[in-house]
């Protein structure tokens, strides 16, 4: 399995260990809440070159031009840094710091060294995936994240994995519609929404969101969208038409 292989080889990753951070930490939570207060959903736009699910970025390969097109519509950016399967590059994060927008490090983080490196390249939020990490491990990793003043996006797909999520004040909870074990979209976003709502934390819906289905999605504070935006789908325009009132979309 691809994701298992990535985790198994994390100790072999070549990480940037020189401090290349050029600004303070920016809060993704605050950025999303500001959008919500203005009756908008927060959009986290993803930059990636390819993914094992079959996506190849042929349209928006220049991350600077990509940002110029989307920056007025987004609450933050998600940048893939995993190299082997996603062609990610840590230097993308270093470069995007100049825009003063919250940056989510999209990788399969499993140790303190990866968190420290993510901080040094300019990341603000660390992704932790509950489907592949035990609760004790998540708690340990988030202690490190908090010690650096960063936030954590803790995502799950399997509803049973939800109980592994720590509900600390620096946490955002994400529901990934994609099963990372099969790479298929298996949507239980309405049930997941109820679980997340019980924590009182901000929620993010992830994967397979397009201009055709975004209006049918349940209420989340934010949506993480990659392939559709990168493929020049009109999903950002559709998202801008949605009124977020704190209880649902209209």
UniProtKB/Swiss-Prot annotation:
It is an enzyme of class 4 (lyase). Keywords: Amino-acid biosynthesis, Aromatic amino acid biosynthesis, Decarboxylase, Lyase, Tryptophan biosynthesis. One of its GO terms (biological process) is L-tryptophan biosynthetic process. Disulfide bonds: none annotated. SUPFAM superfamilies: Ribulose-phoshate binding barrel. It catalyses: 1-(2-carboxyphenylamino)-1-deoxy-D-ribulose 5-phosphate + H(+) = (1S,2R)-1-C-(indol-3-yl)glycerol 3-phosphate + CO2 + H2O. Pathway: Amino-acid biosynthesis; L-tryptophan biosynthesis; L-tryptophan from chorismate: step 4/5. This is Indole-3-glycerol phosphate synthase. The gene is trpC.
């Amino acid at each position: 399995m691809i994701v298992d292989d990535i985790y198994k080889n994390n100790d072999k990753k070549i990480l940037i260990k020189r401090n290349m951070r050029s600004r303070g930490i920016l809060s993704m939570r605050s950025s999303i809440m500001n959008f919500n207060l203005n009756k908008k959903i927060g959009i986290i736009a993803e930059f990636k070159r390819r993914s094992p699910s079959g996506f190849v970025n042929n349209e928006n390969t220049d991350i600077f031009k990509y940002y110029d097109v989307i920056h007025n519509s987004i609450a933050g950016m998600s940048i893939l840094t995993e190299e082997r399967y996603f062609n990610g590059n840590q230097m993308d994060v270093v470069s995007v710091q100049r825009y003063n927008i919250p940056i989510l490090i999209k990788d399969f983080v499993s140790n303190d060294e990866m968190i420290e490196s993510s901080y040094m390249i300019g990341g603000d939020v660390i992704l932790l995936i509950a489907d592949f990490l035990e609760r004790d491990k998540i708690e340990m990793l988030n202690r490190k994240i908090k010690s650096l003043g960063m936030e954590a996006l803790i995502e799950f797909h399997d509803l049973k994995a939800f109980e592994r999520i720590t509900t600390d004040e620096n946490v955002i909870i994400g529901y990934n519609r994609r099963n990372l074990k099969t790479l298929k979209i298996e949507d239980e976003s309405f049930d997941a929404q109820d679980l997340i709502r019980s924590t009182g934390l901000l929620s993010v819906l992830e994967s397979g969101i397009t201009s055709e289905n975004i209006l049918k999605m349940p209420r989340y504070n934010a949506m993480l969208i990659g392939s559709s935006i990168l493929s020049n789908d009109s999903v950002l325009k559709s998202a801008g038409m949605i009124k977020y009132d704190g209880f649902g979309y209209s």
